Amino acid sequence: MAKNYYDITLALSGICQSARLVQQLAHQGHCDADALHVSLNSVIDMNPSSTLGVFGGSEANLRLGLETLLGVLNASSRQGLNAELTRYTLSLMVLERKLSSAKGALNTLGDRINGLQRQLDHFDLQSDTLMSAMAGIYVDVISPLGPRIQVTGSPAVLQSPQVQAKVRASLLAGIRAAVLWHQVGGGRLQLMFSRHRLTTQAKQILAYLTPEL
Protein backbone atom coordinates (compact mmCIF):
# COMPACT_ATOMS: atom_id res chain seq x y z
CA MET A 1 0.00 0.00 0.00
CA ALA A 2 1.40 3.38 -1.04
CA LYS A 3 2.24 5.69 1.84
CA ASN A 4 0.55 9.07 2.10
CA TYR A 5 3.54 11.38 2.30
CA TYR A 6 1.32 14.43 2.71
CA ASP A 7 -0.03 13.15 6.04
CA ILE A 8 3.36 11.75 7.06
CA THR A 9 4.99 15.14 6.39
CA LEU A 10 2.31 17.02 8.34
CA ALA A 11 2.72 14.76 11.37
CA LEU A 12 6.51 14.92 11.18
CA SER A 13 6.26 18.71 11.00
CA GLY A 14 4.20 18.56 14.18
CA ILE A 15 7.07 16.78 15.94
CA CYS A 16 9.57 19.30 14.57
CA GLN A 17 7.36 22.23 15.60
CA SER A 18 7.43 20.99 19.19
CA ALA A 19 11.20 20.56 19.00
CA ARG A 20 11.59 24.14 17.75
CA LEU A 21 9.34 25.49 20.50
CA VAL A 22 11.43 23.67 23.11
CA GLN A 23 14.58 25.17 21.61
CA GLN A 24 13.16 28.70 21.52
CA LEU A 25 11.98 28.44 25.13
CA ALA A 26 15.26 26.98 26.39
CA HIS A 27 17.42 29.66 24.78
CA GLN A 28 15.15 32.74 24.91
CA GLY A 29 12.52 32.06 27.57
CA HIS A 30 9.74 32.69 25.07
CA CYS A 31 8.53 31.16 21.82
CA ASP A 32 6.18 31.58 18.86
CA ALA A 33 2.86 31.94 20.73
CA ASP A 34 0.66 30.96 17.76
CA ALA A 35 2.67 27.81 17.06
CA LEU A 36 2.59 26.94 20.77
CA HIS A 37 -1.20 27.27 20.82
CA VAL A 38 -1.54 24.94 17.83
CA SER A 39 0.78 22.35 19.37
CA LEU A 40 -0.86 22.44 22.80
CA ASN A 41 -4.33 22.22 21.29
CA SER A 42 -3.29 19.11 19.35
CA VAL A 43 -2.89 17.29 22.67
CA ILE A 44 -6.45 18.02 23.74
CA ASP A 45 -8.30 17.37 20.46
CA MET A 46 -8.90 13.63 20.81
CA ASN A 47 -11.26 13.26 17.82
CA PRO A 48 -9.79 15.16 14.86
CA SER A 49 -11.40 14.72 11.45
CA SER A 50 -8.05 14.34 9.66
CA THR A 51 -4.29 14.58 10.10
CA LEU A 52 -4.46 18.29 9.32
CA GLY A 53 -7.39 18.57 11.73
CA VAL A 54 -5.05 17.69 14.60
CA PHE A 55 -3.31 21.00 13.93
CA GLY A 56 -6.41 23.16 13.57
CA GLY A 57 -7.22 22.35 9.94
CA SER A 58 -4.74 24.78 8.39
CA GLU A 59 -1.33 24.09 6.88
CA ALA A 60 -0.28 27.59 7.96
CA ASN A 61 -0.49 26.41 11.58
CA LEU A 62 2.51 24.17 10.86
CA ARG A 63 4.67 26.77 9.12
CA LEU A 64 7.24 26.74 11.94
CA GLY A 65 7.30 22.94 11.95
CA LEU A 66 7.63 22.65 8.18
CA GLU A 67 10.53 25.10 8.13
CA THR A 68 12.16 23.24 11.02
CA LEU A 69 11.66 19.90 9.26
CA LEU A 70 13.51 21.19 6.20
CA GLY A 71 16.37 22.29 8.44
CA VAL A 72 16.52 18.88 10.13
CA LEU A 73 16.35 16.95 6.85
CA ASN A 74 19.08 19.04 5.25
CA ALA A 75 21.34 19.54 8.26
CA SER A 76 24.92 18.94 7.19
CA SER A 77 26.39 19.85 10.58
CA ARG A 78 26.15 17.68 13.68
CA GLN A 79 26.73 20.74 15.83
CA GLY A 80 24.74 23.83 16.74
CA LEU A 81 21.02 24.51 16.69
CA ASN A 82 20.09 22.07 13.92
CA ALA A 83 21.83 19.27 15.84
CA GLU A 84 19.71 20.17 18.89
CA LEU A 85 16.53 20.04 16.83
CA THR A 86 17.47 16.68 15.34
CA ARG A 87 18.21 15.30 18.80
CA TYR A 88 14.88 16.50 20.21
CA THR A 89 12.97 15.13 17.20
CA LEU A 90 14.60 11.69 17.34
CA SER A 91 14.25 11.53 21.14
CA LEU A 92 10.50 12.21 20.88
CA MET A 93 10.20 9.38 18.35
CA VAL A 94 12.02 6.99 20.69
CA LEU A 95 9.80 7.95 23.64
CA GLU A 96 6.65 7.50 21.57
CA ARG A 97 7.67 3.95 20.69
CA LYS A 98 8.17 3.22 24.40
CA LEU A 99 4.78 4.73 25.16
CA SER A 100 3.06 2.66 22.48
CA SER A 101 4.27 -0.57 24.10
CA ALA A 102 3.34 0.51 27.64
CA LYS A 103 -0.37 -0.24 27.97
CA GLY A 104 -0.65 1.16 31.48
CA ALA A 105 1.01 4.43 30.51
CA LEU A 106 -1.29 4.80 27.48
CA ASN A 107 -4.38 4.35 29.64
CA THR A 108 -3.09 6.83 32.21
CA LEU A 109 -2.28 9.31 29.46
CA GLY A 110 -5.81 9.09 28.08
CA ASP A 111 -7.33 9.65 31.52
CA ARG A 112 -5.09 12.63 32.24
CA ILE A 113 -5.86 14.26 28.87
CA ASN A 114 -9.58 13.89 29.59
CA GLY A 115 -8.87 15.81 32.78
CA LEU A 116 -7.25 18.59 30.74
CA GLN A 117 -10.39 18.91 28.64
CA ARG A 118 -12.44 19.51 31.79
CA GLN A 119 -9.97 22.16 32.99
CA LEU A 120 -10.33 23.97 29.66
CA ASP A 121 -13.89 24.84 30.70
CA HIS A 122 -12.40 27.10 33.36
CA PHE A 123 -8.91 28.08 32.20
CA ASP A 124 -7.28 29.34 29.00
CA LEU A 125 -5.13 26.88 27.04
CA GLN A 126 -1.95 28.89 27.68
CA SER A 127 -2.74 29.71 31.31
CA ASP A 128 -0.24 28.73 33.99
CA THR A 129 -2.80 26.20 35.28
CA LEU A 130 -3.11 24.32 31.98
CA MET A 131 0.60 24.59 31.28
CA SER A 132 1.43 23.10 34.67
CA ALA A 133 -1.13 20.34 34.17
CA MET A 134 0.37 19.38 30.79
CA ALA A 135 3.88 19.53 32.22
CA GLY A 136 2.72 17.26 35.04
CA ILE A 137 1.44 14.70 32.55
CA TYR A 138 4.80 14.70 30.79
CA VAL A 139 6.72 14.28 34.07
CA ASP A 140 4.42 11.59 35.47
CA VAL A 141 3.61 9.54 32.37
CA ILE A 142 6.23 10.14 29.66
CA SER A 143 9.51 10.83 31.50
CA PRO A 144 9.56 7.52 33.42
CA LEU A 145 9.53 5.63 30.10
CA GLY A 146 13.08 6.94 29.48
CA PRO A 147 15.56 7.90 28.19
CA ARG A 148 14.96 11.46 29.36
CA ILE A 149 15.37 14.27 26.86
CA GLN A 150 18.24 16.55 27.84
CA VAL A 151 17.15 20.10 27.05
CA THR A 152 20.03 22.51 26.45
CA GLY A 153 19.86 26.29 26.50
CA SER A 154 20.43 29.22 28.82
CA PRO A 155 20.84 27.98 32.43
CA ALA A 156 19.28 31.20 33.75
CA VAL A 157 16.26 30.82 31.47
CA LEU A 158 15.80 27.13 32.26
CA GLN A 159 15.61 27.87 36.01
CA SER A 160 12.23 29.54 35.50
CA PRO A 161 9.32 27.27 36.57
CA GLN A 162 7.13 28.83 33.87
CA VAL A 163 9.68 28.05 31.17
CA GLN A 164 10.14 24.52 32.49
CA ALA A 165 6.36 23.96 32.33
CA LYS A 166 6.14 25.27 28.76
CA VAL A 167 9.08 23.10 27.69
CA ARG A 168 7.45 19.97 29.13
CA ALA A 169 4.06 20.87 27.67
CA SER A 170 5.73 21.31 24.27
CA LEU A 171 7.42 17.92 24.62
CA LEU A 172 4.02 16.38 25.40
CA ALA A 173 2.72 17.92 22.17
CA GLY A 174 5.70 16.39 20.39
CA ILE A 175 4.72 12.96 21.71
CA ARG A 176 1.18 13.56 20.40
CA ALA A 177 2.57 14.35 16.96
CA ALA A 178 4.83 11.28 17.07
CA VAL A 179 1.82 9.06 17.86
CA LEU A 180 0.05 10.58 14.87
CA TRP A 181 3.14 10.09 12.70
CA HIS A 182 3.10 6.35 13.32
CA GLN A 183 -0.67 6.17 12.83
CA VAL A 184 -0.35 7.61 9.31
CA GLY A 185 2.56 5.36 8.32
CA GLY A 186 5.63 7.23 9.53
CA GLY A 187 8.82 5.45 10.56
CA ARG A 188 12.38 6.45 11.42
CA LEU A 189 13.84 4.72 8.36
CA GLN A 190 12.11 7.36 6.24
CA LEU A 191 14.48 9.95 7.67
CA MET A 192 17.31 8.07 5.98
CA PHE A 193 15.75 6.57 2.86
CA SER A 194 12.89 8.97 2.03
CA ARG A 195 14.61 12.25 2.86
CA HIS A 196 14.17 13.64 -0.66
CA ARG A 197 10.47 12.70 -0.72
CA LEU A 198 9.84 14.38 2.64
CA THR A 199 11.82 17.47 1.64
CA THR A 200 9.88 17.83 -1.62
CA GLN A 201 6.53 17.42 0.15
CA ALA A 202 7.40 19.96 2.86
CA LYS A 203 8.54 22.49 0.23
CA GLN A 204 5.32 21.98 -1.73
CA ILE A 205 3.16 22.62 1.32
CA LEU A 206 5.15 25.74 2.24
CA ALA A 207 4.92 27.01 -1.34
CA TYR A 208 1.12 27.02 -1.13
CA LEU A 209 1.06 29.08 2.05
CA THR A 210 0.47 32.80 1.76
CA PRO A 211 3.78 34.60 2.31
CA GLU A 212 4.05 36.34 5.66
CA LEU A 213 3.81 40.12 5.27
Swiss-Prot record:
Its main location: cytoplasm. GO terms for cellular component: cytoplasm; plasma membrane. Keywords: Cell inner membrane, Cell membrane, Coiled coil, Cytoplasm, Membrane. InterPro entries: HflD, HflD-like_sf. It comes from the Bacteria. The keyword Coiled coil applies. It is a peripheral membrane protein. Residues 79-122 form a coiled coil. Pfam families: DUF489 (PF04356). SUPFAM superfamilies: YcfC-like. Gene3D superfamilies: HflD-like. It is found in: Cytoplasm; Cell inner membrane. Belongs to the HflD family. PANTHER family: HIGH FREQUENCY LYSOGENIZATION PROTEIN HFLD. NCBIfam families: PRK00218.1-1 (NF001245), PRK00218.1-2 (NF001246), PRK00218.1-4 (NF001248), PRK00218.1-5 (NF001249). This is High frequency lysogenization protein HflD homolog.
